[in-house]
Design a protein with these regions (language model features):
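Short, solvent-exposed turn/loop segments enriched in Gly/Ser/Thr/Pro and often Arg
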Residues: 34-37, 85-89, 244-253, 307-314
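Substrate-gating cap/lid region and adjacent catalytic-acid/histidine neighborhood
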Residues: 109, 117-124, 141, 145, ...
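Serine-hydrolase-like catalytic core of hydrolytic proteins
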Residues: 1-144, 191-211, 234-236
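Bilobed periplasmic-binding protein/Venus flytrap-like ligand-binding cleft at the lobe interface
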Residues: 97, 288-299
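Short glycine-biased active-site loop of nucleotidyltransferases that positions the nucleotide triphosphate
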Residues: 21, 99-103, 252-258, 311-312
Length: 323
């Protein structure tokens, strides 16, 4: 599932290609879903009419998951061995779905790259009241008072106004909503109750990921802290979690191992990249694709690897480094 802060993004980015996976016996399906105001606008009156509102983008993802579950066998796939995988907002989406009763029966492994729905000082979800406050401000910017009036405006106008909204809410004004339908409760409550999908997880960060507090080590905040916290909760449920850190600086860049830089390697699509990739880069990509596809096939990344990738435990913490 692609990222983009729930505001933009698409499923056909250059990194997303399944050739390397297919060579190792894995079928890749990339999906599109509604984003921005079209995917995550919550309206209380709409909820009263339909029974739900605010998670249209997540419902798209669930519909795609249902289609894959029903049809993947026709492509040679196994509907009883589906791995959900996402990066950034795509990882947050994937994480939400591992808490959703609408999706968990169809998910057998989860890969969360640089994203967790609980990855900040507070969960990256809105309560209905918080979501409605954002919606009310958006209606004000658009000069309307209801969702019916909003629907009469051109889509281009809505996107322009959403850009204005983002100046008022710089940290993801559109995000998943705790609606009691897709998401039964807040992720922190569900995690404490053991309400996550009881499956293997593979999750991690890049060395220079986003959202790091000023002056703090990347291991003191943001995505990393969330990954460790969730891993500890999973261990209490005897669920295997494999943690990693991507530390490889991309060639031709001074930005280090920045947010999303690992995608070329986890998909094995270096030949599509404009950067001056070396033999070292290709070897790293092969290692990561091997680990990722091994996890997809058996819930364990250790098939045909040189060094064992140990699961996380509170007593013996292990983080796999890709450098």
């Amino acid at each position: 599932i692609h990222g983009g802060g729930f505001e933009h993004g698409f499923s056909t980015e250059l990194e997303f290609d399944g050739e390397a996976y297919a060579k190792k016996g894995v079928i890749l399906a990339t999906i599109s879903y509604r984003v921005n105001v079209f995917g995550f606008l919550y309206d209380q009156k709409q909820e009263e009419e339909l029974g739900f509102s605010g998670n249209q983008g997540l419902l798209d993802q669930i519909a795609a998951l249902e289609w894959i579950s029903e049809n993947i066998a026709a492509f040679g796939g196994n509907p009883d061995n589906i791995t959900i995988m996402g990066q950034s907002a795509g990882a947050m989406s994937s994480h939400v779905l591992t808490f959703s009763p609408l999706a968990t029966p169809m998910i057998h492994q989860a890969i969360l790259q640089s994203g967790s729905i609980a990855c900040f000082p507070s969960p990256m979800v809105f309560t209905k009241a918080q979501a409605q406050a954002v919606t009310d401000k958006f209606y004000e910017l658009c000069g309307v008072s209801s969702i019916e009036e909003l629907r009469r405006l051109p889509a281009e106008d809505l996107l322009d106004k959403s850009d204005e909204l983002m100046t008022l809410y710089p940290s993801l004004p559109f995000r998943p909503v705790v609606d009691g339908h897709v998401l039964p409760d807040t992720p922190d409550v569900l995690t404490k109750e053991g309400g996550m999908a009881h499956i293997p997880y593979l999750m991690g960060v890049t060395k220079d990921d986003l959202f790091i507090p000023d002056g703090a080590s990347h291991r003191e905040g943001g995505f990393f802290t969330a990954a460790v916290s969730f891993a500890n909760a999973c261990r209490k449920q005897n669920l295997p979690v494999y943690l990693y850190e991507f530390c490889h600086d991309l060639p031709g860049s001074d930005d280090g191992a920045f947010h999303s830089s690992e995608l070329w390697y986890t998909f094995g699509t270096l030949n599509r990249c404009w950067r001056p990739m070396t033999d070292e880069d290709h070897a790293l990509a092969e290692e990561m694709v091997t680990c990722w596809t091994s996890f997809m096939k058996q819930g364990d990344p250790n098939e045909d690897v040189k060094e064992e990738w140990k699961a996380w435990t509170e007593d013996g913490c292990f983080i796999k480094t890709f450098a």
